[in-house]
Amino acid sequence: RKIDVLINNAGAGITGPLEEIPMEKLKTNFETNLFGPIGIINAVLPSMRQQKSGLVINITSIAAYMGLPFRGVYSASKGALELVTEAYRMELKPFDIQMTNVAPAAFSTNIAAGRYHAPENDNSPYKSTYGKTLKLLNGHVDAGQDPIILAKLVHSIIQTKKPKIHYKVGAFLQRFSIILKRLLPDRIFEKLLMSFYRL
């Protein structure tokens, strides 16, 4: 059986104050966003190694590049997948197996429908800030770009002989935020991020 391409596109959203997200929900998110993809990758590697070719595309997120308020678990799980991909790439070089990350920004999908939201508790010290962030997040998804843009990028990567390690796709401002994080002092970038989230 020949497996030429694996696309790890499964992903689960999760929002809430880190202090208030149940540990079981955190673990479930990592199962979907990190451990699941690793398990599938490991399942196909023997076939790819035998045929001396193969491509794995891991769909991560722009959120993987920074810790986002009330999305810390999601940022962490997707960020971990980015780093795992980098490690896999080096380990798999001798077998001519390619691996890459694709980090989308906001796209108009149904991810919000399946996202776990920590309850908005009236007694929570995060009530006002978390509520504002939730509304903002849902607005970003509703106003997101057409997923066909992402699909076309994935198709072009499959046609590429030597894919890059990382691809970012989506609105310019969201992609540019990664560059800003590298260029700006940490405190300045943190202030910009908090301003964006109206915190």
Enumerate the predicted regions with their spans:
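Residue(s) in the substrate-gating loop at a strand-loop-helix junction
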Residues: 61
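Active-site helix of classical SDR
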Residues: 41, 77-80
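Active-site loop immediately N-terminal to the catalytic Tyr-X3-Lys motif
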Residues: 19, 66-72
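C-terminal beta-strand-loop-alpha-helix "lid" module of Rossmann-like NAD(P)-dependent dehydrogenases
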Residues: 93-141
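A short, exposed helix-loop element centered on a Lys and neighboring polar residues
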Residues: 41-42, 86
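Conserved NAD(P)H cofactor-binding loop of Rossmann-fold oxidoreductase domains
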Residues: 9-14
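Substrate-binding pocket helix/loop in short-chain dehydrogenase/reductase
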Residues: 17-18, 25-27
